[in-house]
Swiss-Prot record:
Residues 22-175 form a propeptide. Residues 546-559, 573-582 have a biased composition (Acidic residues). Disulfide bonds join C334-C357. SMART domains: Zn_pept (SM00631). This is Inactive metallocarboxypeptidase ECM14. The gene is ECM14.
Length: 591
């Protein structure tokens, strides 16, 4: 038996040697198609334990590929995961054998090589940090990519998504959810499901549902909600937004306003749902939470679910992972402009202006992206003619769980109020951690797109995976003088990427609601706003009180119905001391 085991190990090693020497995938490791769907009938049987040979094989492969065991299981599209409903042929025809790989980067040479190879092969960079880069590509292209990379990168990658078509298919609302919407609608007054979550946030919603939902909120809560139009898209659609606040009569002072936007990149569905969740939570909690009431009395909030309606609709109808808007370019077969690379401040489109097929194409000129131009003109008009003072801007994206502050285009110079930007960002990160124990990293936006800057000290500019000029973050901060501007990249850290399961909608919304509450407290001043009352914000509706009342039904003295958990109650000990000292922001503002 011992001799047999030794021979088995040698056989596996002999078969595995080509894997480490040849930069390519084996079809056995990354199947083009998932296994047949399991039976729909309740004939479940216990899974047989793994045999000695199977466990030995898995261990050897994991060690050869340097893949931690926990990363080999429960992955989207993992070959051991049998889909209940296999992806239709149309999705497989569009996405083929695409996978998503994560490359671990350690030095400038690796970053430069990866950036150059991605540009040469027109690859889709999903996300990047100072430690890793996620890239979507076809399995057939993997050997070509690895052949352009140094040897250190040829073995420092792992698959995040093995079967992109299946993962995309699973990201769309299920047929059961669609049936629920057809029967119950999407009214905020709809009875809650068994988990007390409003049905609107049980799944991602198409634009055709979001707009009527916004109108309904406006009609139900007209005393504090208005539906406004930011501008028009390339295809002629309105860019709707909700303006929330309690407007005092005859107040000559400029109204302090916070802008929260999402969906600049069409495929980032979680950003759209999160904007809606935070807006809904502020609206419905106004009469039940003194902190929310004070916040809406001091500030107006502008919530823009998606700056890119054309692209968002396109992700629902044609291509789930489309990024740009849908306007024409010089190449008819490569439409679209990246709406977060087309803003006028430090626009660096000269480098990529001749490549409309790039996922980060900024257009031929600053503000070539129609929706970004409309947004900027609306913002300027608000300050010039509508007595508005923008005090904060939050641009929601996905993914990688990062809180970024200016500047994006360069790490030099530092923003004038760097200390305050960092202080508030750290406070937001703490609020998120106490909400659902998720960790968000805080950094300058330039560092978030550069590799290992803290590890490698050099006077030379560090190479970048993506272009970073022309961002909305920098424009609002510099040109519009919005002192507290942030880009927040939401869940997750790459297990699903842009295809985040619907179960994450409510937890992510809870995290960003508390982030907005911390932002409001910081802007109001510690004495003016007071500590957040976590217990007040975390109440669930009592039995029989599942309906959300409209303006005419609200009882100012009843605070029992607040509909959501905004904090993980398993972390009580950590939160009890938080109001006393950890939440005590140091008042170090630079006047």
């Amino acid at each position: 038996m011992r001799l047999f085991a030794h021979l088995a190990v040698l056989a596996i090693l002999a078969c595995a040697v080509p894997i480490t020497a040849i930069p390519s995938f084996l079809s056995n490791s990354y199947p083009a198609h998932p296994a047949e769907g399991i039976s729909l009938f309740p004939q479940t049987q216990p899974q047989a334990p793994l045999g000695l040979w199977t466990r030995l094989r898995n261990t050897v492969i994991e060690r050869l590929w340097r893949v931690p065991p926990q990363l080999c299981k429960n992955r989207p599209g993992h070959k051991g995961k049998f889909p209940l409903f296999p992806a239709p042929a149309s999705l497989r025809a569009r996405y083929g054998d695409d996978v998503v790989l994560r490359f671990t980067i350690r030095n400038a040479e690796e970053v430069k090589a990866l950036a150059e190879a991605s540009n040469i092969l027109f690859l889709d960079v999903w996300a990047s940090t100072d430690e890793w880069v996620d890239i979507r590509l076809s399995k057939d292209v993997v050997p070509s990519l690895l052949g352009l990379l140094p040897k250190s990168l040829q073995t420092s990658h792992i698959p995040l998504i093995h079967d992109l078509p299946q993962t995309i298919y699973e990201s769309y609302p299920s047929s059961s959810q669609r049936s629920s919407y057809d029967v119950q609608g999407f009214s905020p007054s709809t009875k809650h499901s068994s988990d007390k979550t409003n049905i609107f946030f049980q799944d991602y919603q198409p634009f055709s549902v979001i707009v009527p939902w916004m109108r309904l909120l406006t009609s139900m809560f007209s005393s504090r909600v208005q539906m406004i139009n930011i501008g028009s898209t390339f295809e002629g659609r309105d860019i709707p937004a909700l303006q929330i606040g309690v407007w005092p009569a005859n107040n000559p002072k400029p109204r302090k306003t916070v802008v929260v936007s999402g969906g600049s990149h069409a495929r980032e569905w979680i950003s759209v749902s999160t904007v809606n969740y935070v807006a809904y939570s502020l609206i419905t909690n106004y009469a039940k939470s003194k902190h929310v009431a004070e916040l809406l009395q001091q500030f107006d909030f502008i919530f823009i679910p998606t700056l890119n309606p054309d692209g968002y609709i396109y992700t629902w109808e044609v291509d789930r992972i489309w990024r740009k808007n849908r306007q024409d370019t010089s190449l008819p077969f490569c439409p679209g402009v990246d709406l977060d690379r087309t803003w006028g401040f430090k626009w660096d489109g000269n480098i990529t202006a001749d490549n409309p097929c790039s996922e980060s194409y900024p257009g031929e000129d600053p503000f070539a992206g129609i929706e970004a131009k409309q947004f900027s003109q609306w913002a300027k008009n608000q300050t010039a003619q509508n007595n508005t003072e923008f005090v904060a801007f939050i641009d929601l994206h996905s993914y990688s769980q990062q809180i970024r502050y200016p500047y994006s285009y360069s790490c030099q110079p530092d923003p004038p109020n760097l200390e305050n930007l960092e202080e508030l960002a750290i406070g937001i990160a703490k609020a998120i951690r106490l909400t659902n124990r998720e960790t968000y990293e805080v950094s300058s936006a330039c560092e978030g797109l550069m590799a290992s800057q803290a590890k490698v000290k050099s006077d030379d500019p560090f190479p970048r995976i993506e272009r970073t000029g022309g961002s909305a973050l920098d424009w609002f901060y510099h040109d519009l003088n919005v002192k507290y501007s942030y880009q927040i990249k939401l869940r997750d850290r790459g297990s699903y990427g842009f295809l985040l399961p619907r179960e994450n909608i409510v937890p992510t919304g809870q995290e960003m609601f508390n982030a907005v509450m911390v932002l409001g407290r910081f802007l109001s001043g510690h004495d003016g706003f007071g500590p957040l009352d976590w217990e007040d914000e975390s109440q669930r509706p009592k039995a029989g009180e599942d309906d959300i009342p409209s303006d005419n039904e609200l009882d100012e003295n009843d605070d029992s119905w607040i509909p959501y958990d905004y904090r993980n109650h398993d972390d009580q000990n950590e939160g009890e001391g938080y109001d006393n000292d950890e939440w005590g922001f140091r008042r170090r503002r630079k006047r």
